[in-house]
Amino acid sequence: MRVAFIHPDLGIGGAERWVVDAAVGLQNLGHEVDIYTSYCNKSHCFDEVRDGLLKVTVLGDTICPHTIKGKFAIFCATFRQLHLAYELKKGPGSKVDVFVVDQLSACVPLLKLWFPKARVLFYGHFPDQLLVQNRNQMSLVKKAYRYPFDKFEEITTASADRLVVNSHFTKDMFEKTFPATKNPLVIYPCVDTDIKEQQQGLDRDMITAASQYTFLLSINRFERKKNILLAIEAFGEAQKKSSNLKLAVAGGYDFRVNENVEYLQELILACEKLKLSHISITADKYAKLLEKDTPAAVWTSIFKNDVIFFPSASNSFKNTLLHISKLLLYTPQNEHFGIVPLEGMLWKTPVLATNSGGPLETVKDNVGWTVEGKSELWAPVIDKVVHMNASDYAVLQTECVNWVNRFSQDTMASELEEAMEEVRKKAPTENVGWDYIRLGMWYSVLMTLTLSIVLLAIWP
């Protein structure tokens, strides 16, 4: 099959990790795979994209920016994806057998209209309208702005030939949010269970410098909903009993995203309030430090701090941090799935997660703990792991590896392939006639309302 993935912004994050893993997995099964995206920065993406293992084409980025004065992100993302679909109509999309759209469903009906022989599979990470923060506190104007987009999401999601989701928790959320969706298929994301090659790329100088400390690790995008503050506060409590304890905070960070920049500063202020020394290490800063000293000396100096931030950590840094850490702290509440806990288990690192959402399906009692997200409840678990005897910890590590093998890339790719083959055998989902008229009406309302708000916002 010729498969085309469509993703809004191919940066670094859980959704992007899924796209890359799914594309590589299908490619390994012999399928011809292309990824189309509205934005891809080769200095802020996964190695498979940067190194050319996957064919990535940027379309639909020439008319609309990412935001308008830092606002209207959903409007811009929707417009850019529709523009991308239009560019596919000019030629590249005509040979595609299956489109795999994820994260944003705006283009689904257009793909079905313009490419009637192809099938469209939508992979839902979570209903977008449920990701809006402080929704109940939104002003009337903002609610009016969001309403057409929410209806648009409902109609376009239901137009897909097959809806696939990342967990049973997410399945429940889609069924409650979009009653028209029928029995979404659950295909869990994966981790690459063969880490031999990744082990060769570990930073040995970092490992040596870290050997005299006990490390905790948090991996998440620098967003408020990821609740990284919980890791810092729990670490601050636990460090009172273990002075050689360190916390590494790594994750996706994009300087274009205001929240990423603001939240990192909020976390730094939290460290200062708790009297925790800290340092932020970016790729550029690390390179500059190496100009003045040896790698071993650089890491020795860095690890004198209590909390070390790694914005946009490379795979090598992230894997090394997983290798040296005693416990992974996974802080989001009601996370849709959460690939990070599985990555931790892959490196024999047990997990402490909040007792909600997808982690309840992945973090079992024999590989970690799910605890209410309060620092006073997390600190005792951290203390327990830090002082666990070697034999008990070794048993925990073995169970981690045994469990994570159920989430291999081969398993996910095979399940995705089966879903695509099944949907190709069936007639396409009916979404013509009145459905298109209804969609057009909502789209007209959406565009009119949004453009009015935009004009009011930028009018001098």
Swiss-Prot record:
One of its GO terms (cellular component) is endomembrane system. Gene3D superfamilies: Glycogen Phosphorylase B. It catalyses: a beta-D-Man-(1->4)-beta-D-GlcNAc-(1->4)-alpha-D-GlcNAc-diphospho-di-trans,poly-cis-dolichol + GDP-alpha-D-mannose = an alpha-D-Man-(1->3)-beta-D-Man-(1->4)-beta-D-GlcNAc-(1->4)-alpha-D-GlcNAc-diphospho-di-trans,poly-cis-dolichol + GDP + H(+); an alpha-D-Man-(1->3)-beta-D-Man-(1->4)-beta-D-GlcNAc-(1->4)-alpha-D-GlcNAc-diphospho-di-trans,poly-cis-dolichol + GDP-alpha-D-mannose = an alpha-D-Man-(1->3)-[alpha-D-Man-(1->6)]-beta-D-Man-(1->4)-beta-D-GlcNAc-(1->4)-alpha-D-GlcNAc-diphospho-di-trans,poly-cis-dolichol + GDP + H(+). Keywords: Endoplasmic reticulum, Glycoprotein, Glycosyltransferase, Membrane, Transferase, Transmembrane, Transmembrane helix. Glycans are attached at residues 41, 389. Its EC number is 2.4.1.132, 2.4.1.257. Its main location: endoplasmic reticulum. GO terms for biological process: dolichol-linked oligosaccharide biosynthetic process. It is a single-pass membrane protein. InterPro entries: ALG2, Glyco_trans_1, Glyco_trans_4-like_N. The chain crosses the membrane at residues 439-459. It is found in: Endoplasmic reticulum membrane. Pathway: Protein modification; protein glycosylation. It holds the Pfam family Glycos_transf_1. One of its GO terms (molecular function) is alpha-1,3-mannosyltransferase activity. Belongs to the glycosyltransferase group 1 family. Mannosylates Man(2)GlcNAc(2)-dolichol diphosphate and Man(1)GlcNAc(2)-dolichol diphosphate to form Man(3)GlcNAc(2)-dolichol diphosphate. This is Alpha-1,3/1,6-mannosyltransferase ALG2. It comes from Yarrowia lipolytica (strain CLIB 122 / E 150). The gene is ALG2.
